[in-house]
Amino acid sequence: MKSQLLSLAVAVTTISQGVVGQEPFGWPFKPMVTQDDLQNKIKLKDIMAGVEKLQSFSDAHPEKNRVFGGNGHKDTVEWIYNEIKATGYYDVKKQEQVHLWSHAEAAVSANGKELKASAMSYSPPASKIMAELVVAKNNGCNATDYPENTQGKIVLVERGVCSFGEKSSQAGDAKAAGAIVYNNVPGSLAGTLGGLDKRHVPTAGLSQEDGKNLATLIASGKVDVTMNVISLFENRTTWNVIAETKGGDHNNVVMLGAHSDSVDAGPGINDNGSGSIGIMTVAKALTNFKLNNAVRFAWWTAEEFGLLGSTFYVNSLDDRELHKVKLYLNFDMIGSPNFANQIYDGDGSAYNMTGPAGSAEIEYLFEKFFDDQGIPHQPTAFTGRSDYSAFIKRNVPAGGLFTGAEVVKTPEQVKLFGGEAGVAYDKNYHGKGDTVANINKGAIFLNTRAIAYAIAEYARSLKGFPTRPKTGKRDVNPQYSKMPGGGCGHHTVFM
């Protein structure tokens, strides 16, 4: 008997030693995660405390924002890193990278009347260009869309079909002096050219109303435009924060992410403090449980400048490492004040834009979350305008949630979700008014619980989930840019 007890003691010691260093303290004694238990750990007070903390980082600096590489974002990154590290449940790292920051301002007048314009980030500067305005056909995505007399003139282009950067490049190839892109949905237009390019010309954005008025004026006579663009550029060091559970199968990784940066204009509390805090709240709640599959959380940098942080991360993984990631969930703007509950259309049934195999199952899981509670929801398209894009391009199944940005809510949607028709989902989108006061508490709480629901499901088991597609390269979808406004589900505006 003594020898048997000694053998048992040795076995227990060996098992315990095997757990230490691989799994967090107390792991064997934690209950297995379930959907109900993890959701019950989500508290609105914790979520709101988190978004208030992000607001404080913006308020603490003269810039009043959390743009990547700036002080407000540095504070954000350090806080996220330290909060998650302190749990002891995760292996946490900061992934350093350098990206080009750009800030631009524009002044545009037509026939002496000043218009409300915004410069595209990464636009070349322009000092008082004075030229006649001409109109590009279609959406200015092809050389044949530009009039023969474009050289030396400023060209007016409607948003849609291709990126702002491509429009600017095509205008440059046509030897235009500048380009003005106007919105194809109500509201003003601010965006990015996606990076520096010698083909680009000075480029500004206008509202749909102002753009259409200019097109009407040109049809009846000559329009002279004066255009000024001030552009600043700076290489900035910045970081992704990546945290993976110490426990669970690291060859079957469930991954989720949200971008942690804002635009220059404001603190970015809905866009995307809501997603950042949503996944942080779930990350902290998850520490109460054990799981079967490892879960990897990511807080992406520089999303607002062209999905730079997530793209950098995905490109840093070889096919073998990326194949361990069985799916990716994206959460970008989940607390919009005039919200709609939107789920990425993984099966393509609404927009004919399917994600990689497994994306449909992700969509169905979120649908079940809402359906089981009798809560309305609607699909939103994979447009390539948020951080899932780099994953889809490498054939990783993707999905997630979104409560709306600049698109205007319809009367039909009001019947489903409440709110106000004729008003954007987020009227403070990309503006200084995107503060804590901009958050819809009901929306952010519900969507954070939905995140917990999905993570609990996949952390327990991937049974029934399609075999992970072979890692490869693919387009997000050749039709993605044809969505109204460049996307009714994603908001990094480079198209």
UniProtKB/Swiss-Prot annotation:
Catalytic residues of the enzyme: 303 (proton acceptor)
Highest taxon of the lineage: Eukaryota
Enzyme Commission number(s) of this protein: 3.4.11.-
Example GO BP: proteolysis
First and last residue of the signal peptide: 1-21
Subcellular location field: Secreted
Residues holding Zn(2+) 1: 259, 271, 332
Short name of one Pfam family: PA
Glycosylated position list: 142, 235, 272, 352
Sites annotated Transition state stabilizer: 429
Main subcellular location of this protein, as a coarse class: secreted
GO molecular function, one term: aminopeptidase activity
Cofactor note: Binds 2 Zn(2+) ions per subunit.
Function according to Swiss-Prot or TrEMBL: Extracellular aminopeptidase that releases a wide variety of amino acids from natural peptides and contributes to pathogenicity.
Family of this protein: Belongs to the peptidase M28 family. M28A subfamily.
Full protein name: Probable leucine aminopeptidase 2
Source organism per UniProt: Arthroderma benhamiae (strain ATCC MYA-4681 / CBS 112371) (Trichophyton mentagrophytes)
Gene giving rise to this polypeptide: LAP2
